[in-house]
Amino acid sequence: VTFHQARPHTEQDLEIYRIVVDTWNRTGTRVSYVDLPENLRTHQNTASFLDRFKVVAGNLPYAQTIVAHIARDGHYFIHPDIEQNRSITPREAARIQTFPDNYCFESKKGTPSRTLAFKQIGNAVPVCLAYHIALSLLARFADQN
C-alpha cells in the first residue's frame, strides 16, 4: 500500500489535534476555532472557517467530502485515534474516496509526491459514486433504445 505515511505536524497543531479529537471522542461535537485556547489560535479571522479542525468520524453513516485543500494541510481531516494524533494519510483519504489500495497516483517526473496525491484524491469523484452514475446513465441510454 503506497502513500500510507502521515505528513509532519507542528507541536501547536498536535496540541490542537489532541483537544479536537478528545472533544469529539467524548462528546461527538466539533470544536470551534474560537473555543480553542487563545495561545493556540494563530489566525486573526474569528468570523469564518470556525470549523477548520475536524475529526474524520468513522462511526457516522457517511464520510465527509475529501477536497483538494487537503494538499495544503490536514486540519479538516484529523485521524480519530488520539494515540496516533495526526491528520489522515493520502492512502486513508483515497480509501474514503473508494480508490482501490492498488491504485497508483501519478506525479511529476516519476517522483512520488504526497501533495500531488492529496490533490488528485481531493479533485476526484469518488470511485464508487462514478461507477453508480455510469450504471445509471447506461440504464437510461438502454431505455431510450
Regions found by a protein language model. Name each.
Residues V1-N145:
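C-terminal target-recognition/interaction regions appended to catalytic cores
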